């Protein structure tokens, strides 16, 4: 198996763990979304600053730098949508709804880069998209008829998936002009820019500061929304550079499987660490 395939599969595993910890921080610890998003952007901005101060890319067109920065901008809005839904819904429902991105990537990569997928690859893409549609279906609340109900709010995640797909295509377009480390670092600056503009308010900063001073809580967010995302993006950027972006995106469709499996395992082994409730219908979906 080629190394880029392993990297493409390792990425959703890393971010599945991140997702479950995010749910714990948001729902378990009750961290407000503005403070949470500030840390998400700020932590990546810190990593970016360290890398770029020590090794800034030279001889690169300004347009390429802007494109790398725009990757973070697009992904920032994707994350804002996802975190907002994650605070309200279970991870095993939110993450599949994000997996419409492979179909966008596959179609656009075919148009832009001339990439093509085999029938089996297209099957993998459609399974990912089908899972996202099922995740937007829920059972009527108590006192209702118990019918399956479509939740329009999940369309917000579909929009986020389109933005994520666009960012992956930009990554593919500039991979020959910048190193993997530089792309991920400049992406971090773009992420920080949006999060700071939208959420940098005195109350949010104070709440974040108080949270980071709590030794029992701070490590969760430092590792899960600091160290792990930076390394996760190194993995997927490397994979995009070495393999077809459409296939890399399709392999990222394994994330819902990892989230579901880790959630089920956590519910069994460490129920206090998992903030999700399984029902028979959701298990079937």
Language model: regions and residue ranges:
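Transmembrane alpha-helices of multi-pass small-molecule transport proteins
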Residues: 10-21, 27-77, 127-130, 184-207, ...
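Hydrophobic/aromatic residues within transmembrane alpha-helices
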Residues: 25, 36, 85, 111-113, ...
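Alpha-helical transmembrane segments of compact multi-pass small-molecule transporters, enriched
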Residues: 43-47, 97-111, 123-126, 189-194, ...
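Glycine-/small-residue-enriched transmembrane alpha-helix faces in small-molecule transporters
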Residues: 1-32, 77, 146-182, 189, ...
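Loop-to-transmembrane-helix transition segments
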Residues: 3-10, 39, 49-52, 57-81, ...
């Amino acid at each position: 198996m080629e190394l880029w395939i392993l990297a493409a599969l390792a990425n959703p595993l890393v971010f599945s763990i991140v997702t479950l910890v995010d749910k714990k921080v948001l729902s378990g610890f009750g961290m407000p979304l503005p403070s949470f998003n500030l840390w998400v952007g700020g932590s990546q901005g810190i990593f970016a600053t360290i890398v770029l101060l020590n090794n800034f890319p030279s001889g690169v067109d300004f347009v390429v730098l802007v494109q790398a920065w725009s990757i973070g901008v697009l992904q920032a809005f994707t994350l804002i949508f996802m975190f907002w839904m994650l605070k309200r819904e279970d991870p095993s429902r939110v993450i599949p709804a994000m997996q419409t991105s492979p179909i966008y990537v596959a179609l656009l990569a075919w148009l832009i880069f001339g990439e093509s997928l085999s029938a089996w690859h297209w099957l993998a893409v459609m399974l990912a998209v089908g899972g996202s549609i099922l995740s937007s279906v829920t059972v009527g609340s108590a006192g209702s008829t118990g019918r399956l109900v479509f939740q329009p709010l999940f369309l917000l995640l579909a929009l986020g998936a389109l933005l994520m797909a666009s960012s992956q295509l930009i990554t593919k377009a500039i991979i020959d002009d910048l190193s993997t480390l530089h792309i991920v670092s400049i992406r971090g600056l773009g992420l920080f820019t949006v999060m700071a503009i939208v959420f940098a308010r005195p109350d949010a900063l104070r709440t974040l500061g108080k949270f980071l001073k709590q030794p029992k809580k701070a490590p969760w967010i430092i590792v899960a929304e600091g160290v792990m995302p930076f390394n996760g993006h190194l993995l997927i950027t490397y994979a995009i550079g070495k393999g077809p972006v459409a296939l890399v995106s399709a392999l990222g469709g394994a994330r819902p499987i990892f989230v579901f499996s880790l959630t089920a395992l956590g519910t069994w082994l460490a129920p206090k660490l998992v903030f999700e409730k399984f029902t028979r219908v959701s298990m079937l979906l």
